[in-house]
C-alpha cells in the first residue's frame, strides 16, 4: 500500500508495504479500510488529507489489480504490432535519467515501485526516449 510521497533515502517511509499480505489474502482491502477509518475516528492527530490519500491509493491498487485480473490478456496484447525491443538500459537502470534509474533500482532492490514511478514511465514511453 502506498502514499503519494516518495523519499529516496527511505523507501518505506511513506509506504505501509502491506501488498504482500493483501495479495496472499492474509488481510482484505475491507479490513484495511475499516482499520484506517477506525484509527482516524479515534485520533486527534491524523490529518484527513493523509487518510484520504491512503484510502485513494488502496482503491487505486484494487482497481489496477482488478484490471490485471480480468483483462490481462487484452493488456498484454501487442495491439499496434510493434516489433522494436527496448534497450538493455531499461533492464539495468542505466538510462541516465535519474528518476527512471531510481525507479528501476527500487523495483529490483525492494520489489516495489510506487505509482509515481509508473507515471514517469508512461511519460517517457509516450515521448519515446
From Swiss-Prot:
Signal peptide: none annotated. The keyword Transmembrane applies. It is a single-pass membrane protein. It is found in: Membrane. The chain crosses the membrane at residues 103-125. Its main location: membrane. This is Uncharacterized protein R853. Gene3D superfamilies: 1.25.40.80. Keywords: Membrane, Transmembrane, Transmembrane helix. It comes from Acanthamoeba polyphaga mimivirus (APMV). The keyword rRNA processing does not apply. GO terms for cellular component: membrane. InterPro entries: Crypto/Photolyase_FAD-like_sf, UV-DNA_repair_photolyase.
Amino acid at each position: 500500500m502506498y502514499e503519494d510521497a516518495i523519499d529516496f533515502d527511505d523507501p518505506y517511509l511513506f509506504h505501509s508495504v502491506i501488498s504482500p499480505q493483501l495479495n496472499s489474502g492474509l488481510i482484505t482491502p475491507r479490513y484495511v479500510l475499516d482499520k484506517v477509518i477506525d484509527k482516524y475516528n479515534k485520533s486527534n492527530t491524523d490529518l484527513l488529507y493523509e487518510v484520504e490519500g491512503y484510502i485513494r491509493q488502496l482503491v487505486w491498487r484494487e482497481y489496477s489489480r482488478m484490471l490485471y485480473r480480468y483483462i490481462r490478456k487484452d493488456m498484454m496484447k501487442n495491439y499496434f504490432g510493434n516489433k522494436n525491443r527496448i534497450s538493455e538500459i531499461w533492464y539495468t537502470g542505466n538510462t541516465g535519467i535519474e528518476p527512471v534509474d531510481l525507479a528501476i533500482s527500487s523495483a529490483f532492490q525492494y520489489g516495489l515501485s510506487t505509482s509515481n514511478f509508473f507515471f514517469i514511465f508512461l511519460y517517457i514511453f509516450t515521448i519515446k526516449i
